[in-house]
Amino acid sequence: MSLSIELEFKQDVLLVRLTGELDHHTAEELRSKITEAIEKESISHLILNLQHLTFMDSSGLGVILGRYKQVHNNGGEMVVCAISPAIERLFNMSGLFKIIRFEPNEANALQKLGVA
């Protein structure tokens, strides 16, 4: 299966909706799309909606951690929302939830970043 990447801009927030599998085959495409969008659109914050993400491996974790650092170094925040139980376990095991905020849905994530 492949990965579908949907980007939406709301003020200074980049909202990324992922559908499918985030693995070593698709991680580079996600990295480049998010990095390009952050740089071109003056994005401060990043929301990842993982509701329809069915699989993620360590390559996906690496991309997410790298984008967290990119946003954080620019004074912004990253929020992950609508995560499935399987992906949530991966986040917990990797320790990503210690540094990346989790919200139950997009509306909550946008509200926490001041966009409603």
Curated annotation (Swiss-Prot):
Enumerate the Gene3D superfamilies for this protein.
STAS domain
Keyword Phosphoprotein carried by entry: yes
A UniProt-annotated Pfam family: STAS
- Entry function: In the phosphorylated form it could act as an anti-anti-sigma factor that counteracts SpoIIAB and thus releases sigma f from inhibition.
Q: Name one GO biological process term.
A: sporulation resulting in formation of a cellular spore
| Alphabetized UniProt keyword annotations | Phosphoprotein, Sporulation
**Ranges of residues in domain STAS:** 3-113
Question: What InterPro entries does its record include?
Answer: Anti-sigma_ant, Anti-sigma_F_ant, STAS_dom, STAS_dom_sf
Q: What is the recorded name of this protein?
A: Anti-sigma F factor antagonist
- Phosphoserine modification sites are 58
The record describes its post-translational modification as: Phosphorylated by SpoIIAB on a serine residue.
| Phosphoprotein as UniProt keyword | yes
GO molecular function terms attached to this record: anti-sigma factor antagonist activity; antisigma factor binding
Family, per the entry? Belongs to the anti-sigma-factor antagonist family.
